[in-house]
């Protein structure tokens, strides 16, 4: 069967457009039956949680803690995945009959992960059992100290082990453990927590339906942590997105009522651009505690105050982010002049460490080079956040250089580390060496990839509504990008902030288009007909919905 025949068969069987069927084929669909995985949101795709190594051990540990009424603490991370995972554990274990205390790390006071100070605080409070979420898989020394304090330790993580041995916890749940048969290696930490609780409820006879109210938190984490959209992640995220509108959780109700652009549907863009930044803002500006309190709050007056505080944090975050970005550009020129290396390492005194990761991502995108943004603290310790560009692997680059870090961790595309300020120049040299080992070369004139060539007449509101069937869009399920040829440009206007607005015209079809931060395209657009690369989005203005093209580039 040719692709043309397959797209026709998919369109006919599932009553969708040929264009949507073509997108499904690009997603790897090779038969009409495979298309059901994408189009039927109710098609189950969950793996048996008991396939996860050490699941029985973990259940026995918390069951014994409940039986003996032990004091249990949940300790997470300061990003949304750690916050959501902590909320799921605190809420669902409490529902199960095991009340827990919780604590989160603070970027500005102790940094990432478990610390000696934190352990001492929990010991002084009488902690007997510690559950780590979104952290712990590399915390060998810290868990050793917890065990010496007499605590039992359960680790729920989704990061890869360091390769230097596992911590001596009582039980570790992590899909990346050696010999772990759990098929989905792409779970976020909140997803690991959910699977653990699913197994716990199943084993102890508590209704599994009681867990469904926590699924929106799994959706938030899966999208915010940018984990690959595997089949199970797709299923769990969709279930969670569908629960926003009828949740009995006050926080989810508020997020839905105030931040969902379409009250009939919570989409991935609502989470990516509205909900996740709001919930991450408290940890970036002060303490993540505000976000966790918000997610767990059951008092209507208190939750309003918490939401207002989160909104204030988010406003502050935007301003600080813009300020640091401008300073980073200036500092870049001071360090390197016009001769940029393959890896950018940009340091400055006491930048806000909560937003350096956002700035690093923006710089990496702008300069097409992996970038580490480093905030040098008054005590001489420098705190860094790094983001990748192209094929550069941060984890592979940092691992051979771990001798110069006070602490470090990360993935292929992102990393963080603490380093003594006097070693920053050495870091610059060694990162260039690692770029050479990896064969990384910045591609300054990157071609803009697109999925399909279309005519503008195919891009209408019916298609955009139909496109929601492929939600949620994220890692390994990206929002489709289109190419339309011979587009006439009409009514071009330059806007403040370096944006361009115009009408894209092809035949009898005219659609509003905007190019964000792309004033450099103005000359190309003024020349006449262009081949336009874009995303097609829905825009609602004064209650009227219309199609808007978000321009990625011109050919």
Task: Tell me the role of every PLM-derived stretch.
Residues 508-524:
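Beta-strand/loop nucleic-acid-binding surfaces
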Residues 380, 507-510, 544:
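Short acidic/polar mixed-charge low-complexity motifs
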Residues 423-430, 521, 526-555:
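OB-fold single-stranded nucleic acid-binding module
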């Amino acid at each position: 069967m040719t692709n043309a025949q397959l797209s026709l068969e998919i369109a006919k069987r599932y009553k969708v457009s040929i264009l949507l069927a073509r997108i499904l084929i690009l997603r790897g669909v090779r038969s009409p039956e495979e298309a059901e995985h994408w189009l039927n949101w109710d098609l189950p795709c969950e793996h048996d949680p008991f396939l996860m190594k050490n699941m029985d051990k973990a259940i026995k540990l918390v069951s014994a803690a409940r039986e003996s009424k032990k004091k249990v603490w949940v300790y997470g991370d300061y990003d949304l995945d750690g916050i959501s995972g902590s909320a799921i554990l605190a809420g669902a274990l409490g529902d199960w009959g095991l009340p827990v205390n919780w604590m989160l790390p603070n970027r500005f006071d102790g940094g990432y992960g478990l610390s000696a100070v934190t352990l001492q605080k929990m010991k002084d409070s009488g902690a007997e059992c510690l559950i780590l979420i979104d952290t712990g898989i590399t915390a060998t020394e810290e868990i050793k100290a917890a065990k010496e304090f007499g605590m039992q330790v359960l680790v729920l993580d989704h990061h890869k082990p360091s390769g230097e041995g596992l911590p001596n916890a009582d039980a570790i749940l992590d899909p990346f453990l050696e010999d772990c048969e759990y098929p989905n290696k792409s779970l976020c930490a909140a997803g690991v927590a959910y699977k653990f609780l699913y197994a716990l409820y199943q084993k102890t006879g508590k209704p599994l339906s009681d867990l469904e109210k926590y699924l929106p938190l799994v959706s938030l984490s899966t999208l915010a942590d940018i984990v690959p959209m595997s089949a199970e992640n797709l299923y769990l995220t969709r279930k969670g997105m569908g629960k926003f509108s009828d949740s009995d959780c006050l926080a989810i109700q508020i997020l839905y009522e105030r931040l969902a652009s379409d009250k009939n549907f919570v989409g991935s863009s609502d989470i990516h651009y509205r909900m996740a930044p709001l919930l991450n803002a408290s940890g970036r500006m002060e303490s993540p505690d505000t976000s966790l309190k918000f997610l767990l709050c059951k008092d209507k007056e208190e939750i309003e105050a918490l939401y207002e505080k989160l909104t204030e944090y988010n406003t502050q975050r935007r301003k600080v982010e813009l300020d640091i970005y401008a300073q980073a550009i200036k500092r870049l020129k001071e360090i390197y002049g016009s001769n940029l290396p393959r890896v950018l390492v940009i340091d400055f005194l006491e930048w806000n460490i909560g937003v350096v990761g956002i700035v690093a991502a923006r710089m990496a995108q702008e300069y097409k080079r992996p970038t580490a943004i480093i905030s040098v603290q008054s005590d001489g310790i420098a705190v860094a956040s790094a983001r990748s560009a192209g094929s550069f692997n941060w984890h592979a680059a940092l691992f051979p250089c771990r001798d110069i870090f006070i602490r470090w961790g990360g993935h292929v595309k992102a990393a963080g580390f603490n380093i003594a300020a006097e070693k920053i120049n050495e870091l610059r040299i060694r990162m260039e060496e690692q770029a050479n080992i990896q064969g990384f070369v910045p591609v300054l004139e990157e071609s803009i990839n697109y999925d399909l060539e279309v005519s503008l007449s195919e891009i209408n509101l019916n298609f955009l509504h139909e496109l929601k069937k492929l939600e949620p869009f994220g890692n390994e399920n990206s929002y489709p990008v289109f190419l339309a040829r011979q587009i006439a440009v009409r009514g071009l206007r330059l806007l403040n902030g370096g944006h361009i607005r115009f009408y894209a015209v092809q035949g009898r079809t005219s659609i509003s288009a905007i190019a964000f931060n792309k004033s450099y395209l103005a000359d190309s657009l003024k020349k006449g007909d262009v081949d336009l690369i874009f995303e097609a989005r829905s825009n609602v203005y004064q209650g009227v919905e219309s199609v808007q093209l978000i321009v990625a580039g011109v050919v």
